[in-house]
From Swiss-Prot:
UDP-N-acetyl-alpha-D-glucosamine binds at T10, G11, G12, N124, S195, Q295. It is found in: Cell membrane. The gene is murG. It comes from Bacillus subtilis (strain 168). Belongs to the glycosyltransferase 28 family. MurG subfamily. Keywords: Cell cycle, Cell division, Cell membrane, Cell shape, Cell wall biogenesis/degradation, Glycosyltransferase, Membrane, Peptidoglycan synthesis, Transferase. Cell wall formation. Catalyzes the transfer of a GlcNAc subunit on undecaprenyl-pyrophosphoryl-MurNAc-pentapeptide (lipid intermediate I) to form undecaprenyl-pyrophosphoryl-MurNAc-(pentapeptide)GlcNAc (lipid intermediate II). One of its GO terms (cellular component) is plasma membrane. GO terms for molecular function: glycosyltransferase activity; UDP-N-acetyl-D-glucosamine:N-acetylmuramoyl-L-alanyl-D-glutamyl-meso-2,6-diaminopimelyl-D-alanyl-D-alanine-diphosphoundecaprenol 4-beta-N-acetylglucosaminlytransferase activity; undecaprenyldiphospho-muramoylpentapeptide beta-N-acetylglucosaminyltransferase activity. Its EC number is 2.4.1.227. It is an enzyme of class 2 (transferase). Pfam families: Glyco_tran_28_C, Glyco_transf_28. It is a peripheral membrane protein. This is UDP-N-acetylglucosamine--N-acetylmuramyl-(pentapeptide) pyrophosphoryl-undecaprenol N-acetylglucosamine transferase. It catalyses: di-trans,octa-cis-undecaprenyl diphospho-N-acetyl-alpha-D-muramoyl-L-alanyl-D-glutamyl-meso-2,6-diaminopimeloyl-D-alanyl-D-alanine + UDP-N-acetyl-alpha-D-glucosamine = di-trans,octa-cis-undecaprenyl diphospho-[N-acetyl-alpha-D-glucosaminyl-(1->4)]-N-acetyl-alpha-D-muramoyl-L-alanyl-D-glutamyl-meso-2,6-diaminopimeloyl-D-alanyl-D-alanine + UDP + H(+).
Amino acid sequence: MRIAISGGGTGGHIYPALAFIKEVQRRHPNVEFLYIGTENGLEKKIVERENIPFRSIEITGFKRKLSFENVKTVMRFLKGVKKSKSYLAEFKPDAVIGTGGYVCGPVVYAAAKMGIPTIVHEQNSLPGITNKFLSKYVNKVAICFEEAKSHFPSEKVVFTGNPRASEVVSIKTGRSLAEFGLSEDKKTVLIFGGSRGAAPINRAVIDMQDVLKTRDYQVLYITGEVHYEKVMNELKSKGAADNMVTKPFLHQMPEYLKAIDVIVARAGATTIAEITALGIPSVLIPSPYVTANHQEVNARSLGQHDAAIVLKETELSGEKLIEALDRIVLNEQTLKEMSERTKSLGVPDAAARLYSVLEELKK
């Protein structure tokens, strides 16, 4: 079996693709993959590290306002389609899967026009422009939020969930918090603002230090590498809480999640998939800087089921953050109920569901 995959720009499009690749490899050890991305995108570095064959095309995203750049983008799209067709003709895949980001546009479009079975996987509650465009041409659209269904041709939509959920659930032996000098007997909160960190979350954490010092729970706080030095200087000046460990980045984060009781994070699709699969209660602070404010819609899908406390960035403060944490961590019943509600929204077999869609197409 041969499968071509495309998706990139952010980890939210790349990691679900890699999780799906692992699922197929588990079932078919001799499967061959080709990943098509951009030369300068995050996907090249991540995918090649996994020893997956990688080819690149040149493509940029559309601007939302009319501009000459969009004319250039159309030209790049057409060139990308031509190049994708040559890659696909050489590789001869049984199916092509796009996981979002503008790079998958020319690749999946080319595959559809060549008559190759195609799937797009939409991770968010509000779909991106590329997947909406591709939905007219592909065989199936796999979604992770019921809210996304109305944006696609209904006869093509299949609810699969995010394969990243299957990956975190499959981790049998997690890493120990003792690596960071944290107690394995205390309730633990993980705070992080995405791969690059988030300045507003960092500000709130710094501001809540005096109150945090008096709490019996502990915090593992990830600043993001670009913010680390500035945050450490401020914590040194203010006096950091003894029950908090601060790191710039957490490699292999999924391996630590089973030791975490509550998460404070943005509301990206990967985060939602992971915490719902594991049943981890959360305080979600959606990024307002994403397309169509889709993170807030993601967050509300948990908030409306009382599976998360949602704080908008405009209302975030140290006081509000510690209040939200206290509501969950200091009440065993609340913690237990939120964990159960969160887990009820998870799709731990998402990778297997997406694989089933692929198998159906190949018949």
